[in-house]
């Protein structure tokens, strides 16, 4: 079950392209060990999500064109398109515990948002924000509609290392469900 990169039978060994784990080894510009071969998408083995592949391809194209750009896997959103939706970006509590890292968790019910209540009759949900010792946002996990539309905002905070105070200086439109991030 699941997906995995298929690197066999591609003839990569003929080009001396290195394999790392289950995928093709690439650098931050998506360049393989061969100076003229780039890789993006599932074949890299990092994140088997279409939106990651789009970004990896963009980074590769930028590098080919001489435009400075680097791939970062720090804040790739993952979404489960169910009802209610689930969305996640950044680190998880389990990951942090396993690595012995200290962190804080702030949980707030999605029903704190009047817009969420109006659009999700009898709906429940949760926003969980994870911060490090310096109060930097390092993870966000959402349960409730429209989590898939909100998670990108949290991803920007994770990717850029915003503290909670820096993040809260952003003005969120009212009434929106995304305000839940501001309230967390």
Where are the regions a protein language model picked out?
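Small-molecule pocket liners
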Residues: 22, 77-78, 127
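Internal hydrophobic alpha-helix adjacent to the cofactor/substrate pocket in enzyme cavities
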Residues: 51-74, 101-102, 160-161
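Flexible, glycine-rich terminal cap/loop adjacent to redox cofactors
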Residues: 65, 82-92, 97-184
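Flexible, acidic loop-helix segments that line cofactor/substrate-binding pockets
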Residues: 70-85
């Amino acid at each position: 079950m699941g997906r995995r990169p298929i690197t066999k039978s591609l003839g990569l060994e003929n080009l001396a392209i290195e394999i790392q784990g289950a995928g093709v080894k690439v650098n931050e510009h998506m360049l393989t060990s061969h100076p003229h071969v780039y890789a993006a998408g599932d074949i890299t083995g990092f994140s088997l999500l279409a939106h990651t592949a789009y970004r990896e391809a963009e980074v590769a194209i930028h590098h080919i064109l001489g435009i400075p750009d680097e791939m970062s896997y720090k804040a790739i959103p993952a979404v489960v398109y169910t009802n209610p939706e689930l969305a996640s970006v950044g680190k998880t509590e389990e990951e942090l515990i396993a690595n012995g890292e200290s962190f804080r968790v702030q949980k707030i019910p999605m029903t704190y948002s009047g817009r969420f209540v109006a659009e999700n009759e009898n709906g429940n949900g949760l926003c969980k924000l994870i911060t490090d010792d310096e109060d930097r946002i390092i993870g966000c996990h959402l349960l409730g509609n429209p989590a898939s539309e909100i998670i990108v905002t949290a991803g920007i905070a994770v990717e850029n290392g915003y503290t909670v105070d820096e993040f809260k200086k952003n003005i969120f439109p009212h009434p929106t469900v995304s305000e839940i991030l501001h309230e967390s």
